[in-house]
């Protein structure tokens, strides 16, 4: 067995340096507008407009990414997907950090989102108004994902 293979032990409930984070991100749209969620708390550096995020969360042990995406939409925006397109499985190991594996979805919502748990506000903007960063996602990546999904 090679030293660098991705073989892990049983799941744990705490963050562990050098481990693996499997997450789902839902880039949310409704009637052509981008839906952003103001969620105070976790704030990465470089955001222009405050605590703006797309719904995201870690996958639970054994949870399918599609099910996680639907769960996250209900938690953040009390909403359901009209359409859901997986546009990328993003894998990166930032220097000195853990492995990040993210399932990136473009989601068209059935109805407008409502504030879920710990959501301060919901903003709908035109795609051309995208800030430089939304959560950990750069504007250029968001635009690329929208293009891949045919939602640009």
Where are each of the predicted segments found?
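Nudix hydrolase/Nudix homology domain
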Residues: 44, 49-52, 113-152
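Active-site-adjacent beta-strand/loop module that shapes the phosphate/pyrophosphate-binding cleft
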Residues: 30, 82, 90-114, 144
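Acidic, metal-coordinating catalytic segment for phosphate/diphosphate chemistry
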Residues: 1-25
């Amino acid at each position: 067995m090679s030293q660098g293979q991705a073989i892990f032990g049983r799941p744990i409930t705490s963050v562990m340096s050098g481990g693996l984070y499997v997450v789902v991100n839902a880039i949310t749209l409704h009637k052509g507008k981008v839906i952003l969620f103001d969620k105070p708390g976790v704030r990465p550096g470089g955001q222009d407009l405050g605590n703006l995020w797309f719904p995201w969360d870690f996958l639970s042990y054994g949870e399918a990414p599609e099910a996680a995406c639907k769960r996250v939409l209900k938690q953040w925006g009390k909403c359901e997907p009209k359409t859901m397109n997986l546009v990328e499985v993003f894998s990166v190991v930032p220097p000195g950090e853990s492995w990040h594996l993210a399932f990136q979805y473009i989601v068209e919502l059935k109805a407008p989102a409502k504030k879920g748990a710990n959501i301060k506000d919901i903003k709908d903007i035109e795609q051309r108004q995208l800030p430089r960063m939304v959560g950990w996602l750069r504007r250029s990546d968001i635009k690329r994902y929208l293009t891949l999904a045919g939602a640009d």
